[in-house]
Amino acid sequence: IILSVIYFICQHTGKKKIVASVLIFILCCGLGYSDSFAFWQKDLTYEGESIYNYLQVSETDRQVVLSTNVLFGVQSLYMKEGGLTGMYYDYAMAAPLMVPDKPVEDMNVLILGMGTGTYATQCRKYFGDMNIEGVEIDEKITELSREYFSLPEDVKVTTYDGRAFLQAVETTYDVIMVDAYQDITIPFQMSSVEFFTMVKDHLKDGGVMVVNMNMHGNKEGDINQYLADTIANVFDNVYSVDVAGSTNRELFASQHSDMIEVLSDHVENLSDAGLQNMMWRGADNSVAYAAGDYLMTDDKAPVELLGMQVIDQLIQEEVAYYKDIYEEQGISGLLEHL
């Protein structure tokens, strides 16, 4: 713009237009500037970036939400009153109740993909003073978990890759939660036979692994089938349950065969009615999974291609819905549904 102004001044033309343009430019710079990337979002509690993510924290009177996407995607949710979230964390709380012959308050729990610690916070609330530690690769998210999501200070969080952490420690756990799959971003090194074998080796006798898979698929050879088959080829007993109202699916795996029976016995003795109802729902909807031939290994784990296939399918389903409306009701009917 400076070069343009110099040019027109030298040509002795359009002086009034130059002055007006410069004033408008200055006015726009002063009034039109926003340091918020999501400029349409109001009243964000926090907005910033880390090495790995764009981060938003928003809150209401009831809850605090972390999102790592601008338009969509809730990565973590914390209920200020400490109740159930209605999300996959609630279903995953069945894992400690599947472990036989040990009080839940005495269990050691490891969370790979700690996020803001919602699962750890809920386990502490409902199961007592469990020994919980987490691994989270994004240190900024861990900082936010302490500041906004009430993660207890005595819950240790290591800033590290989940698989690298398992390679570095010899500790065994009663429950290992794998929650490192975000949207279509699935780390290949945490989706292979070799990785899940490593998880199994870090479980105590009777221990349970719970995996949060956040994309439903209903086609042969989709990403969920690859993950489930891979896990079922490592563990002797695998159960899955779909999370109501979302695309999440929880998968429970163990070497002991009485997971659901042990869960039912523990649920009968729960004192919290809300948690008890939630656990009964999970137990009733759990489906045994038999191993198939879709395997991912360190040498071949096409998670990006499989993830994009699911996204393409979701887009096609949405487009088909609106296409049917257009064909039946025309443009006016389509506009009414938007």
Residue spans of the language-model regions?
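The AdoMet/dcAdoMet-binding core of the Class I SAM-like
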Residues: 83, 90-210, 214, 218-228, ...
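Membrane-embedded alpha-helical segments of integral membrane proteins
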Residues: 1-11
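Soluble small-group transferase modules, centered on the S-adenosyl donor enzyme superfamily
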Residues: 13-76, 81-82, 88, 94-100, ...
